[in-house]
Amino acid sequence: LDLAQLPTEVWPNGELPADLASRVQPLFSTDFYREKWLVAVDGSQIEIALDQGEVKAGEFAEPICELELELLSGDTRAVLKLANQLVSQTGLRQGSLSKAARGYHLAQGNPAREIKPTTILHVAAKADVEQGLEAALELALAQWQYHEELWVRGNDAAKEQVLAAISLVRHTLMLFGGIVPRKASTHLRDLLTQCEATIASAVSAVTAVYSTETAMAKLALTEWLVSKAWQPFLDAKAQGKISDSFKRFADI
């Protein structure tokens, strides 16, 4: 990074301190090659980027091999449609760690990542029921993503947390079942069942997390959240309930 190229207004006195450039050292670096494709899906323009290389910090390094999808124009549903087409092939999984997150972790000495038991659900003070539903599923997805990363990196104890996160999804769907009918999540629940069976029978973490069953189940949960897929199944009475106070719903 050439600090002299930064605009003068970023510096306290309007100019680069004389000795700053010599004192600043990078925490980590990324060195990767990017290939890009422009894809049209249902009238939307999507960029697919394939990055291959490594992220390094001191003596530590780990490989980069990832696909990124960016919607350039059009509908978000087109990105999800393309993602579904991609994960129907084995060898892909929905990751959660950015290059920067991995770089900072390496810069801290690459410590072992710890198991994180599921925390108490926290929502905004005036959240409605729908926001509570979303928060619960987002918590489950975050737990799934985090512990899947640990599991595939060699922490076998994280497998149980992955299964616990999937169970939390099921429990959430059941808890809100008085408002959101089961038929709204039939496809999602079917994919979760296939995913659980794959995880239970897999000979290794890599086999499980890079399977189409796991990838499609996790993406289905993401899509269910992003598109609010429960809404078309709500009648007028359910619409009223889901817009009501989450605190009142939880107290009951």
Segments predicted by a language model, with ranges:
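Function-determining surface determinants
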Residues: 1-252
